[in-house]
């Protein structure tokens, strides 16, 4: 089977690239009409002059596909991108919901998650029409949260809902076990003389790095532990900064505490995994993540995670395998922090609950090993790569009904 793809990025590697042994994968991005239509925007992006938020860039540049020449593919597998074809078989992996223009994003992120205003959106209606056609063989949601967002979009368009729901299914991303047993994990953690936390994240402020450092600095006055911090302190969106001197304050806090903070701007992935294996607990007190792949990577290392309770994190993490920090979310489990007042509430809640949770862990370190064991069991149960590949093969061969009947 020849499968057309648009990227070999992290998401593609995670979800579908090289998942089937008998498949050949072909990059078909340069066949895309919309790529050439938006060539001027791509040029501005390349030279760093495209004045758009990451969300605007994605909605303008990545979410539409129409082949201008025959691609000679048996099937396409896209990530969040709509295929505007009535004949070419295709499958789409859904991160949040599709289609995903700015109007839908703003509605999903609003405090009441009211999507009624999109009913007259012609772009959304056109995309759903193509999703409803028989040549679209599957909408694969990354989580139940993603599936719920998709259903809320479909509720606004009942004329397409029945046909699309028939091919909507949740498949959790595959993940190999990185360590095989709890005894192996114990041997790794023995290498650290003190209880060790780890924080890994390029998008430092969005993923709660600021709050992590502030809270741990306070707790260090009462408890003895170390932190491994792997981040280039990147800012992906300005809205996650709390002040104009956040970056300077963060760098100073790190430099003033290098006696217990092991800081790396970046490391090769194999070295990152070694650090995770040696750590007792990982931290992801994120302001926003649609899935949080790092959670399942940490769990595959037998390292339980402290995370916020938003989007898919309530599915990948719970009190059996880790610790959840409750933060303000709407009915679609999307965090509420659009206004300055909402951001203040979110920050204060996150900081307070993170402090309480980390202190609890430090006072109950005996719980960590049990959660570590449960992490390994959870990865085996929900993220088995072989089972995932078999399900993907059924979807590609237009047999998604067999999977849905067994859910």
Report each predicted region and the residues it spans:
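A charged, aromatic-enriched C-terminal amphipathic alpha-helix characteristic of glycosyltransferases
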Residues: 59, 345-356, 360-397
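Aromatic "clamp/platform" in nucleotide-sugar-dependent glycosyltransferases that forms part
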Residues: 287
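A short, active-site helix/loop in glycosyltransferases that binds the activated sugar's phosphate group
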Residues: 131-166, 177, 244-245
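Conserved donor-binding/catalytic core segment of Leloir-type glycosyltransferases
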Residues: 140, 175, 179, 188-207, ...
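Nucleotide-activated donor-binding/catalytic signature segment of Leloir-type glycosyltransferases, i.e.
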Residues: 231-233, 240-273
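Acceptor-binding helix/loop patch of EC 2.4 sugar-transfer enzymes
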Residues: 43-45, 92-127, 329-331
